[in-house]
């Protein structure tokens, strides 16, 4: 389950940051989940809560934001979103993209010109977009 590995990496990053900043407590963490990753938000949240247990981040608010997948055709310049073509993909293909987002080029093509030569503008990956900490003596 790669969600636990993602949660572990997020937790280690949050705790490292908090330590470097001299935090007494982590109040909140905001995590952006790229739509192409199709990450199980509930699993990541549960894993983070478990991994935060016994640390200065225990009880921190965990906020998720999904970043929609956007593509740009290198052939004709057309920009489109995954949600515009997702219904045309069968479940197996969606699962393949979930586990290996790089395969998206094999399964998608520009809805305007049909080219498979496109870039992923956004919506790939997982990253921390904010960490709210508290230092001793602050509220």
Swiss-Prot record:
Name of the protein: Hydrogenase maturation factor HypA
HAMAP family recorded:
HypA_HybF (MF_00213)
User: In terms of domain of life, where is this protein from?
Assistant: Archaea
One Pfam family this sequence matches: HypA
Q: Which family does it belong to?
A: Belongs to the HypA/HybF family.
* UniProt keyword annotations, A-Z: Metal-binding, Nickel, Zinc
Gene Ontology terms: biological process: protein maturation; protein modification process
UniProt organism field: Pyrococcus furiosus (strain ATCC 43587 / DSM 3638 / JCM 8422 / Vc1)
Which residues are noted in the entry as Ni(2+)-binding?
Answer: 2
Q: Where does Zn(2+) bind?
A: 73, 76, 110, 113
Q: Which InterPro entries match?
A: Hydgase_Ni_incorp_HypA/HybF_CS, HypA/HybF
Job of this protein: Involved in the maturation of [NiFe] hydrogenases. Required for nickel insertion into the metal center of the hydrogenase.
Cystine connections:
none
Q: Name one GO molecular function term.
A: nickel cation binding
Question: Which PROSITE patterns does the record associate with it?
Answer: HYPA (PS01249)
UniProt cross-references to PANTHER family, sorted A to Z: HYDROGENASE MATURATION FACTOR HYPA
Q: Which residues form the signal peptide?
A: none
